[in-house]
């Protein structure tokens, strides 16, 4: 799997879309609520954005989240074979401090005009304990396939084991991570309105 290709596409597509719409980095930062430094670091392929900033950027640019991840657009149903789900894009859960935290395997990357983003996510162990909560418009569904996940949601924390699931409004500040430095695997579906 060539992860760097997928990662390069994210920063190239963001910059291209921003320039096509004649939006400056300053405007994108202001309208998305993100730091200008973060936008610059993403566009220079220094940092990999987590889903929350990417969703905010997509909304400002008037595109769906999948625009950053797609290879092609299919109008009809999209079948994702097991071998196709092995291609991954790695995201950090905090773009300023970390280069990689989760590997996202898109299950719908060629579906045109979608509002849901289904992923199998390999969650890497982390020693971090001071997680920065993020929020964005939409909803998320997570089911644990392997390991134990800890979901910080508002002022509450939930431990989910294999087979457990959670569905929440992502406008509430949240953070998803593996429990106590262990690896885990989840099925996640992110819904973002356009």
Predicted feature locations:
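Single conserved hydrophobic/aromatic residue that forms the stacking wall/gate
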Residues: 1-11
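Alpha-helical residues within the helix-turn-helix
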Residues: 19, 30, 59
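Short alpha-helical DNA-recognition segment
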Residues: 22-41
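DNA major-groove recognition helix of helix-turn-helix/homeodomain DNA-binding modules
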Residues: 52-67
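Conserved short histidine dyad/triad with adjacent acidic residue
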Residues: 84-94, 100-110, 118-136, 170-173
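Ligand-binding loop in jelly-roll beta-barrel domains
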Residues: 100-103, 161-162, 170-194
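Short acidic-glycine-tyrosine-enriched beta hairpin
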Residues: 107, 154-169
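Short, conserved beta-strand element in jelly-roll/cupin
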Residues: 122-124, 135-151
């Amino acid at each position: 799997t060539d992860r760097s290709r997928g990662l390069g596409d994210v920063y190239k597509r963001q910059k291209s879309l921003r320039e096509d719409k004649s939006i400056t980095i300053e405007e994108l930062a202001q309208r998305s609520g993100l730091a200008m430094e973060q936008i610059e670091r993403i566009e220079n392929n220094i940092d990999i954005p987590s889903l929350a900033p990417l969703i905010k950027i997509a909304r400002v640019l008037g595109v769906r989240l999948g625009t950053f991840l797609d290879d092609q657009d299919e109008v009809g149903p999209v079948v994702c074979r097991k071998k196709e789900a092995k291609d991954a894009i790695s995201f950090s859960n905090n773009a300023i401090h970390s280069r990689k935290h989760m590997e996202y395997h898109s299950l719908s990357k060629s579906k045109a005009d979608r509002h849901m983003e289904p992923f199998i996510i390999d969650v890497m162990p982390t020693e971090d304990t001071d997680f920065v909560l993020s929020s964005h418009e939409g909803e998320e569904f997570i089911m644990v396939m392997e390991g134990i996940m800890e979901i910080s949601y508002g002022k509450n924390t939930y431990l989910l084991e294999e087979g457990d699931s959670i569905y929440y409004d992502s406008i509430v500040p949240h953070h998803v991570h593996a429990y106590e430095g262990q690896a885990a695997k989840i099925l996640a579906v992110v819904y973002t309105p356009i």
